[in-house]
């Protein structure tokens, strides 16, 4: 399955690169209004006090119907706002929050993500498969 990601500081980009995912699309300020015409999993960081980055929100405004699940990066120093963008997107678009990871993720996070992407069933519908 395609993995769409946004990396404002490079951490999510490093996470995706380390995971070795080949079918990817990186959201940028320049392409955030482009259409993706296939199901995808979104990986994003969290900015400010738990907000969804604006390019991600713009992308979802155009492409939310293909969104299957979300994973989010954050910093545990932000307490309850850690990776909160993932919760926000999960609730707003009724998709599962696959996982949360800190900064660019650990090796264990990479293995977990690859396993979840590899086993993700596109036909599961928009029901919650795991709660964080």
Curated annotation (Swiss-Prot):
GO MF, one example: FMN binding
Superkingdom, taxonomy of origin: Bacteria
GO annotation (BP), single: protein modification process
Pfam families from the UniProt entry: Flavodoxin_NdrI
Gene3D superfamilies, A to Z: 3.40.50.360
UniProt cross-references to InterPro entries, sorted A to Z: Flavoprotein-like_sf (IPR029039), RNR_Ib_NrdI_bac (IPR020852), RNR_NrdI (IPR004465)
Function: Probably involved in ribonucleotide reductase function.
Family that this chain belongs to: Belongs to the NrdI family.
NCBIfam families reported for this sequence: nrdI
Descriptive protein name: Protein NrdI
Organism: Staphylococcus epidermidis (strain ATCC 35984 / DSM 28319 / BCRC 17069 / CCUG 31568 / BM 3577 / RP62A)
